Design a protein with these regions (language model features):
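Bacterial N-terminal signal peptides that target proteins for export
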Residues: 2-12
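Sec-dependent signal peptide cleavage junction
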Residues: 19-40
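Short, solvent-exposed loop/turn segments enriched in Ser/Thr/Gly
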Residues: 65-72, 164-170
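Asparagine-centered strand-capping/turn motif at beta-strand->loop junctions
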Residues: 74-80, 173-178
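Short acidic/proline- and small/hydrophobic-mixed sequence motifs that coincide with surface turns
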Residues: 80-85, 100, 129, 178-183, ...
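Short beta-strand and strand-turn-strand segments in soluble, beta-rich domains
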Residues: 84, 94-104, 148-151, 193-201
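Intrinsically disordered, low-complexity Pro/Gly/Ser/Thr-rich segments with frequent PxxP/GP/PP motifs
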Residues: 100-127, 197-223
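Terminal connector regions
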Residues: 123-166, 222-237
């Protein structure tokens, strides 16, 4: 392991504020956001894409398949009802507007006035995508209570360089709820200035109430785009 480990000192807060570390500052969890992204106009569905992005990995000497990594930060603007199984859809096109592929990602739930992040990837054959369209489908509201993201707290976030692959992100997450969970999703959004440039998610199973668990996120991409900050989000899964 290289000695120059990028260490990020994350504040022990639930709603993350940007924290200046030794190299890459980290934002933990949901409601406070460090970006000044242009928010999409709220639709009648009350499901808002707060931020979204994609990263295109072209073909190279090791792979004749191109990939698109995509993500969307989505907010439930309803004050009383939760959203069950939120869905984002993705369409990748070439420079002529021809569709290279389409995909979707489905989440678990979003509590009222809460925000979660959905991520995934897709291949576009041997042609790298030129444009990628990301949309949120009309949500399904429910009176069932959803786990809020502010019951999770992340600490000790660190970017660890690796010899043959891009740096992994490690840290710890504390669950402050009172009921055990089947699992959680932990997402890192890599930022360059105000722009999100990459995102990756990992999952942990069997989370006990009051427990603290270590995690690591190993990006599947061959390399990470240049970035100067990382936001970490946790949700029930």
């Amino acid at each position: 392991m290289k000695s120059a480990i990028k260490k990020v000192i994350a504040a022990c807060v639930v709603c993350g504020a940007m924290v200046t570390g030794l190299s890459v500052p980290v934002t933990t969890n949901v409601e406070a956001t460090t970006i000044q992204a242009k928010k999409q106009k709220k639709s009648a569905s009350k499901l808002e894409i707060v931020d979204s992005g994609y990263y295109v990995q072209p073909t190279d000497e090791y792979s004749d398949t191109a990939y698109v990594y995509f993500w969307a930060k989505i907010k439930n603007n309803d004050k009383k009802k939760s959203i069950d199984f939120p869905v984002i859809t993705v369409t990748a096109k070439d420079e002529s507007g021809n569709v290279l592929g389409s995909s979707s990602q489905t989440g678990m739930s979003i509590a009222p006035k809460d925000t979660v992040v959905l991520t995934s990837m897709m291949d576009t054959g041997d042609t790298p995508a030129t444009t990628v369209e990301i949309k949120a489908k009309k949500p399904k509201f429910t009176s069932r209570k959803a786990i809020k993201s502010n019951v999770f707290e992340t600490t000790n976030i660190t970017e660890v360089p690796q010899e043959y692959t891009c740096a992994k992100l490690t840290g710890e997450v504390t669950y402050k709820g009172k009921k055990d969970l089947d699992g959680i999703a932990i997402t890192a959004i890599y930022k360059s200035g105000d722009k999100s440039v990459f995102a990756e998610t990992t999952y942990l199973n069997d989370i006990e109430a009051g427990s603290t668990e270590a995690f690591e996120i190993n990006p599947l991409s061959n390399e990470l785009p240049d970035h100067d900050s990382v936001e970490v989000y946790v949700q029930n899964w």
